[in-house]
């Protein structure tokens, strides 16, 4: 898990049930609890966001209805689901040209299956909401429930009740039903149950309810919730040689799609490490010694996600309580109890190291009834297991290979896992009873649908056009020996190397000269500069040798240590703006691979200096394509970096790039408004005219942020365009690009379940009726399942046909110059990602504006 997905998962597990000791007012650390107290009864997401259709309920009514699920256990509700906010965003109805149809026509038809199952309900199914009154009033919620459900014969077995609002799958005989109950001490209580709302199956509250119900089903199947997803601890994959365990599981969501309410279910894996946090701390202390241990421990542990197996909950480590040990006490009810005794009495666990310090996890969610959070959770390292992988583990080829053997599923394996889930749902009696009482069921097969495979593109290079194998989506062989569109001659460039790498530096230089000729690149011999293998020496060598007229700097690094790489990029991107290429010596140390590596390096160097490699046919004239992405920089005070890349020419081979650091709380588009104006001025300078059509691909939009893009970012983009002249009104399209999705598609090719071919478009069945959206499978993968990309056109006054929008989007996936093949997203999105990542990871400052016209970040 990376990026935004990781950010979403950090923090206490979304589905944690109350664990003793119970909820109390906020406490100081002296009285902090060893495990989280009762989580908040958070509000239903998606409330009031959907614009009411004619006859639909008001926002006020939605708020009232939503309150009815407040007391369903938060574990069942699955935590705060931001994707429900997005389901209330209606954009298609504002675009006249796609109101009737948003489907394309190009390409050849292909039969597909998708990881979706239809939710079926009995005819005329509805969810009925009732308000419940007690006379005399009853304070205890538990007592109110007990008194009400003395009348199960009248109400039925299926019900959800929060103490005031009742939901039933069946309509009671009368709009107002009066019931009489009796407390244990003989007090008579009159209960009035009044019908207040009848909710259709596709209402937002019903959709929320289906998801709650499905989480209940997963628990009946003995699956454990960790974070937002459910995993099976009874069927783990153990990798003992690396001390790792994998729990298989599923990520699920139920939403309204084009013509059906469907469950989307995809395979998920939770990687657990066999070592506890205490084991890790012991090992770290041995490595760094007592004096450096506190600092090193804080650096290594804070921010990590851990799992406590005694309750299968995940927590984010926010701090370390160096003055707390298991012998400290906290208040449980009216008595003081030590952490040590608490774990013994509550879980039967013995703490072996009484001197271990405690971990702190802040509970940010509000307490019941909107009260402040219940205070930090204090965790015992001995019972906390590390999750996920360290950077060192990710860099270990053997670990990643062994992990992939369990987690990188083929299309056949992935479909098989999902089919097994369907089978388990249909075979389990308890699950069927739960569904039947609510009048619901799931279709017992995956959804079948039709897609289209777009025609493959012809690659234009050196005055020629050629085709490539559409199944591999790669043209590295086809472009060999062909001159590039435009080449920058290398007359003044430097190569830095250490004494140990002198031989590989010479080999690289000779091979670069050999491969550059056929491409059309004129390359003079580089000035060779030796530096000592120290960061200060490297920086000094750069400062002394890189001049204003230097065209390119190549640095051969002895290892992939980040500090040396960062040093090079900071100096050459900020202080002394010069295109640069870093190469790790190991990459060029194998003679048999040197020609291939040198070819890729030569291509990158040419791009970074302003050269153009290849193109595809773009029929639209006076078109500017813009890509926007962002990155969260933890080193720069948790500021976000916004990157914008805009095309300057017809062939989409020249780009203007700008990166800005946002202030905390500032919207990305506020920071990038000036960048868009700069791009338009650069386009005007390059073409002697402004673009008549602008298409913005906005990547990096997380769940729940769609409304902000529509309400705030689109008007800001339009305002920014207006600064070029009040009479300047280009046609504008804004497309939200989403990679982190759980939708998967399977084709049957030569009788086998396989990935859909590159260029597969899906724009029916699994798209959303309120959006102008589509999926494209653009790239090919050699192993595992290919992941589609979701495109949601949130604003479009261009009148461009859906077919043209889809084909243009696919064409742009061919234009990323760091890969001789098709990539998963349009090139400007990938460029923006690379730029934001470079600034967030290495530079931490805005790059020098002299580099704006170059792809220096490739």
From Swiss-Prot:
Name the organs or tissues of expression. Answer: Expressed exclusively in the adult gonads; expression in the ovary weaker than in the testis (at protein level). During neurogenesis and organogenesis, expression is detected in CNS (midbrain and eye) and fin buds. Starting from 24 hours post-fertilization, expression is found in the genital ridge.
Q: Where is this region: MID region?
A: 476-612
Q: Which cofactor does it need?
A: Mg(2+)
Residue ranges annotated for the Piwi domain, each copy included:
552-844
Keyword RNA-binding among record annotations: yes
Where does the entry annotate site (Required for binding 2'-O-methylated 3'-end of piRNAs)?
Answer: 378
> Which intervals of the chain are annotated as region Disordered?
1-56
Comment, domains: The PAZ domain specifically recognizes binds the 2'-O-methylated 3'-end of piRNAs. The MID region is required for recognition of uridine in the first position of piRNAs (g1U preference, also named 1U-bias).
The name on file for this protein is: Piwi-like protein 1
Q: Which organism is it from?
A: Danio rerio (Zebrafish)
Q: What is the lineage of its organism?
A: Eukaryota, Metazoa, Chordata, Craniata, Vertebrata
Q: Which gene encodes it?
A: piwil1
């Amino acid at each position: 898990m990376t990026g935004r997905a990781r950010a979403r998962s950090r923090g206490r597990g979304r589905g944690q049930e109350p664990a003793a000791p119970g909820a109390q007012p906020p406490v100081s650390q002296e009285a902090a609890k060893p495990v989280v107290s009762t989580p908040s009864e958070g509000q239903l997401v998606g409330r009031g966001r959907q614009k009411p259709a004619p006859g639909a309920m008001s926002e006020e009514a939605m708020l009232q209805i939503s309150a009815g699920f407040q007391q369903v256990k938060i574990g069942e509700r699955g935590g705060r689901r931001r994707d429900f906010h997005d389901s209330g965003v209606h954009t298609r109805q504002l675009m006249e040209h796609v109101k009737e149809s948003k489907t394309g026509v190009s390409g050849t038809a292909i039969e597909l299956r998708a990881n979706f199952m239809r939710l079926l309900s009995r005819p005329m199914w509805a969810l009925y909401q009732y308000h419940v009154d007690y006379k005399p009033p009853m304070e205890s919620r538990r007592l109110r429930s007990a008194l009400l459900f003395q009348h199960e014969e009248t109400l039925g077995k299926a019900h959800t009740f929060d103490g005031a609002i009742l939901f039933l799958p069946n309509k009671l005989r009368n709009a107002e039903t009066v019931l009489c109950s009796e407390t244990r001490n003989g007090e008579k209580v009159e209960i009035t149950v009044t019908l207040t709302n009848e909710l259709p199956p596709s209402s937002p509250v019903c959709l929320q309810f289906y998801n709650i119900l499905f989480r209940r089903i997963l628990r009946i199947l003995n699956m454990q919730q960790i974070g937002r997803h459910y995993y099976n601890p009874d069927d783990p994959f153990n990798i003992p040689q690396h001390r790792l365990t994998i729990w298989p599981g599923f990520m699920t969501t139920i939403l309204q799609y084009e013509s059906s309410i469907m469950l989307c279910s995809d395979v998920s894996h939770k990687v657990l490490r066999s070592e506890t946090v205490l084991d890790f701390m012991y090992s770290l202390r041995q490595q760094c010694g007592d004096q450096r241990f506190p600092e090193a421990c804080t650096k290594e542990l804070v921010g990590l996600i851990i799992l406590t197996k005694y309750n299968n909950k995940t927590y984010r480590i926010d701090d370390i309580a160096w003055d707390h040990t298991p012998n400290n006490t906290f208040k449980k009810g009216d008595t003081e109890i030590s952490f040590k005794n608490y774990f013994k009495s509550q879980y039967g666990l013995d703490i072996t190291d009484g001197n271990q310090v405690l971990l702190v996890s802040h509970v940010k969610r509000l307490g019941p009834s909107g009260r402040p959070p219940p205070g930090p959770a204090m965790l015992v390292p001995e019972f906390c297991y590390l999750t996920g992988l360290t950077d060192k583990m990710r860099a270990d080829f053997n670990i990643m290979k062994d992990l992939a053997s369990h987690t990188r599923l083929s299309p056949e394996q992935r479909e098989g896992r999902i089919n097994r889930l369907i089978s388990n749902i249909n075979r389990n009696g308890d699950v069927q009873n739960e569904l039947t009482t609510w009048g619901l069921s799931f279709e017992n097969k995956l959804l079948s649908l039709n897609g289209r495979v777009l025609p493959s593109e012809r690659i234009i290079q050196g005055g020629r056009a050629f085709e490539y194998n559409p199944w591999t989506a790669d043209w590295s062989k086809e472009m060999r020996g062909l001159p590039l569109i435009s080449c920058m001659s290398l007359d003044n460039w430097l190569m830095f190397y250490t004494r140990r790498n002198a031989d590989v530096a010479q080999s690289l230089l000779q091979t670069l000269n050999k491969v550059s000729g056929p491409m059309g690149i004129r390359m003079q011999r580089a000035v060779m500069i030796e530096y000592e293998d120290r960061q200060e020496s490297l920086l000094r060598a750069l400062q002394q040798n890189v001049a204003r007229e230097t065209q390119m700097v190549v640095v051969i690094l002895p290892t992939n240590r980040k500090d040396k790489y960062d040093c090079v990029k900071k100096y050459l991107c900020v202080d002394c703006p010069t295109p640069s290429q870093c190469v790790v010596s190991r990459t060029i140390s194998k003679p048999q691979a040197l020609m291939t590596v040198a070819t890729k390096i030569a291509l990158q160097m040419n791009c970074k200096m302003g050269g153009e490699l290849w193109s595809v046919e773009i029929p639209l004239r006076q078109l500017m394509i813009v890509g926007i992405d962002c990155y969260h920089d933890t080193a720069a005070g948790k500021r976000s970096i916004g990157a914008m890349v805009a095309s300057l020419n017809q062939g989409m081979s020249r780009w203007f790039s700008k990166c800005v650091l946002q202030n905390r709380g500032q919207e990305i588009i506020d920071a990038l408004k000036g960048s868009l104006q700069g791009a338009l001025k650069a386009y005007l300078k390059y073409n002697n005219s402004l673009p008549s059509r602008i298409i913005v691909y906005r990547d990096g939009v997380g769940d729940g942020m769609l409304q902000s893009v529509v309400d705030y970012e689109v008007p800001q983009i339009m305002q920014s365009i207006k600064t070029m002249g009040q009479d300047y009104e280009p046609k504008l399209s804004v497309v939200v690009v989403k990679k982190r999705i759980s939708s998967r598609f399977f084709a049957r090719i030569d009788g086998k379940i396989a990935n859909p071919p590159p260029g597969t478009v899906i724009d029916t069945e699994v798209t959303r009726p309120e959006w102008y959206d589509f999926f494209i499978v653009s790239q090919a993968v050699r192993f595992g399942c290919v992941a589609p990309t979701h495109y949601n056109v949130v604003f479009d006054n261009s009148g461009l046909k859906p077919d043209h929008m889809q084909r243009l989007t696919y064409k742009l996936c061919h234009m990323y110059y760091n890969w001789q093949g098709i990539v998963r997203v349009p090139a400007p999105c990938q460029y923006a990602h690379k730029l934001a990542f470079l600034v967030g990871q290495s530079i931490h400052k805005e790059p020098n504006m002299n580099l704006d016209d170059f792809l220096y970040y490739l």
